Regions:
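Alpha/beta catalytic barrel-like cores
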Residues: 1-122
Length: 122
């Protein structure tokens, strides 16, 4: 895959027959999902769940890009392969959700998305 510009990357991700997999559930969201099926929300179980998604047969050729949660981009699969490498081996491009939620602005009803500050350190 030789994608040098933002336009080439965007075109690849949404090329014919491909979609985007939103695998960016936060840990609290993942916990709710696991609680509903009686599975403890440990880092290992979340990793196994994500690995199951990324290694699925239907991933190759159908998913152009995967949106990841902050924890996921640093995780390795059970065999030690980084989950990012698992995704790229399926022909998909990984990306990361950088926002960390909303914060109220002063006394108004408006809010601001957090997450860009401190991005380099993360």
């Amino acid at each position: 895959m030789n994608l040098n510009s933002l336009s080439e990357i965007a075109s690849y991700i949404v090329s014919e027959g491909k979609g985007i997999l939103a695998a960016d559930e936060s840990n609290p969201t993942c916990t709710k999902r696991f609680d509903s099926i009686g599975v403890e929300s440990t880092e290992e179980n979340r990793r196994d769940y994500r690995e199951l998604l990324f290694r699925a047969e239907g991933m190759k050729g159908n998913i152009g890009g995967v949106i990841l949660f902050d924890e996921t981009i640093r995780q390795n699969a059970a065999d030690g392969t980084s989950l990012v490498d698992v995704i790229t081996s399926q022909g998909s491009l990984p990306g990361i959700k950088v926002d960390k939620g909303l914060q109220p602005i002063g006394d108004s009803e408006e809010s601001l998305t957090q997450g860009l500050e401190g991005l380099d350190e993360r």
